[in-house]
Amino acid sequence: MGTMGKAFYSVGFWIRETGQALDRLGCRLQGKNHFREQLSRHRTLMNVFDKTPNVDKGAFVAPNASLSGDVHVGRGSSIWYGCVLRGDANSISVGAGTNIQDNALVHVAKTNLSGKVLPTVIGDNVTIGHSAVLHGCTVEDEAYIGTSATVLDGAHVEKHAMVASGALVRQNTRIPSGEVWGGNPAKFLRKVTEEERVFFSSSAVEYSNLAQAHATENAKNLDEAEFKKLLNKKNARDTEYDSVLDDLTLPENVPKAA
C-alpha cells in the first residue's frame, strides 16, 4: 500500500471512529432511558492495510479464531477454536486438508537474528496440535506437530516427519523425512513407524470430516438453533420412563415364549 493508500485508510478509520463516538454520546444524552449493549468487535478475518486473508470456501475457520493479514487457507483445511494466524509482517500459507488445532499460534518473521524475511509455509494434510507455536518456518506435507510444540524461524520439517509434544525446534533446524524429534532443544529420537505414518494421513482426514460438522452447526442462525433446542426437548424422554424401560428389558423380566 502506497502513501496515498495509507492516507485514505487513516481518514476512513478516523471517520468510523468519530461516528461511533457520536453514537455513544447520543445514547448518554438520553439519560436513564438509554441502553448500552456490549458487542464484541472480534473479527475472524481481518485485513491489515491491503493484506486480506484468503480462505477457500471448503475450509472451516472457527468463529473465535483470528486470521489477519496475508493468510491463505486451502480447501478442506480447518482452523480450530482460539487459533491465531497473524500474517501482518509476512505471508502464511496453509495447504489443503491441514488441521490447526485449538489455541495454536502461527506467525511470521520480518526480522530475526539471521536478518532474513521469513514467511510460514504449511503443506497439505498436516496436523498441528493444540497450543503449538509456528514462527517463520516450513512444514511439509503430512508432517505432524505435537501438542504445545514450538517451531522457530527458519526451521524446516520435512514430509512425514514428527515433532513430539512440548518440543522446541530451534532456528534453522532441519528435521529429515521420517524422523521423530523431541525435547528442548529438539533432537533426533527415532524413526517414524509405519503405523505413525498411516496415522498422520488418517488424522488429517478425520479432522477434515469433523470440521464439516462444526461448520454446519456454526452456520445456523439463532432461529434454527432455538428450533433445534425445542425439537430436542420435545423428543426427550423422561428419565423415569427410561428407568422403567430398563427394568422391563432386564433378562429376568423378559417374558418367555410359549
Curated annotation (Swiss-Prot):
Membrane topology classification: Peripheral membrane protein
CC annotations in GO: mitochondrial membrane; mitochondrion; plastid; respiratory chain complex I
Pfam families: Hexapep
Binding site for Zn(2+): H107, H130, H135
Keywords linked to the UniProt accession: Lyase, Membrane, Metal-binding, Mitochondrion, Transit peptide, Zinc
Location in the cell: Mitochondrion membrane
Enzyme Commission no: 4.2.1.-
Main location: mitochondrion
Signal sequence interval, chain numbering: none
A GO biological process held by the record: protein homotrimerization
Superkingdom of origin: Eukaryota
Mitochondrion as UniProt keyword: yes
Co-factor(s): Zn(2+)
Record's function text: Enzyme involved in the catabolism of H(2)CO(3) but that does not mediates the reversible hydration of carbon dioxide. Mediates complex I assembly in mitochondria and respiration.
The family this protein is said to belong to: Belongs to the gamma-class carbonic anhydrase family.
Complex formation: Homotrimer. Component of the oxidoreductase respiratory chain complex I; element of the extra matrix-exposed domain, which is attached to the membrane arm of this complex.
The name this protein goes by in its record: Gamma carbonic anhydrase 3, mitochondrial
